[in-house]
């Protein structure tokens, strides 16, 4: 698990257009700040038939290293699955469109950068749909690609309910 101060540092450096606290809330909801997190996405209610919430299924065991995460993700993709991975649970469907390889996108900074790009795109769309408060709609779009589904499945309230305590930096007096 990545500690919150390090995540905030990465978010500020890698996706400066989005508030680091917003990205931290998303990462806490998506991966519990685990950089090697991996989930399998299933279409059309398949996950629910398997007893999993939403459109994804959690793996019984999570990868313990980047190498293991890459091996598992590649194997699942080769088997025809779509996976979400990393701190921000980036969908493998976005990689080619955004010009990244799986290896690149599993790097924490790149994973956060991709999330920042995607959330910026979703915010631009959400501003036309909800000009007074676009973030909740953008979060729903980030989660599901749908402006309502992220509300219905609890994702938006889950992200907005995440607590990210302010980080105080201690400076030793010289």
Which residue stretches match the model-derived regions?
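Non-catalytic cell-wall polysaccharide-engagement segments
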Residues: 1-22, 29, 33-34, 53-174
């Amino acid at each position: 698990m990545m500690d919150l101060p390090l995540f905030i540092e990465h978010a500020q450096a890698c996706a400066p257009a989005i508030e680091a606290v917003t990205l931290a809330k998303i990462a806490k909801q998506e991966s519990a700040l685990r950089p090697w997190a991996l989930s399998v996405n299933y279409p059309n209610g398949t996950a629910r038939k398997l007893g999993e919430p939403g459109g994804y299924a959690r793996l019984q065991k999570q990868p313990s290293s980047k190498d293991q995460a890459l091996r598992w993700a590649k194997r699942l993709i080769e088997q025809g699955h779509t996976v979400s991975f990393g701190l921000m649970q980036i969908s493998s469907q976005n990689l080619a469109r955004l010009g990244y390889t799986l290896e690149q996108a599993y790097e924490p900074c790149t994973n956060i950068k991709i999330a920042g790009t995607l959330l910026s795109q979703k915010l631009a769309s959400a501003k036309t749909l909800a000009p007074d408060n676009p973030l909740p709609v953008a979060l729903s779009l980030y989660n599901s690609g749908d402006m309502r589904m992220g509300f219905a499945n609890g994702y938006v309230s889950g992200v907005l309910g995440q607590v990210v305590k302010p980080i105080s930096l201690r400076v030793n007096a010289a």
